[in-house]
Amino acid sequence: MGRVYENISKEQARWIGKQPMFFVATAAPDAHVNVSPRELDTFRVLGPNRVAWLDLTGSGVETIAHLRADGRITLMFCAFEGLPKILRLYGRGEVREPGDAGYDELRPSFPDLPGERAIIEVSVGRIADSCGFGVPRMDLVGPRDKLLTSTERKGPEKMAKYRTLKNTQSIDGLPGLGPKHP
């Protein structure tokens, strides 16, 4: 199967929108390789070679740190039900924190969610699909709400302290969120 495309087609964008999650892979020189799962409700296809997602506060900051150091990123979407398929978007990512250039332009594209820390914008240079025959079929039970309820319970002040503690540098000591982050 494995085809390569120059642009994200409307059909591919619709298919992406039906997937409940995606995976983000990044690496910086001489650092650990990182792969993180993300929920799709925060992901947007902004154009044929441009995507972004609203990044929520987590216990690590590897994706942000790696993008600041290197910029390379791969996003992977898998069909867990229906016809088997894997779609990968290869590109270069930019971190847009509140107050950064481009953040205010992108922000209206996303829902208001507690704990947002940045928008990750990706310029996609390669789109490739593959058969997905090795991806298991799974039934989605539903989203987990623990991240959102925990963030709401802590409130903005405690979340800012948490980000200072957990999100200012990666596990390899690379810079994560900037000091201006609320």
Predicted segment positions?
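Binding-site signature for planar aromatic cofactors or substrates
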Residues: 1-182
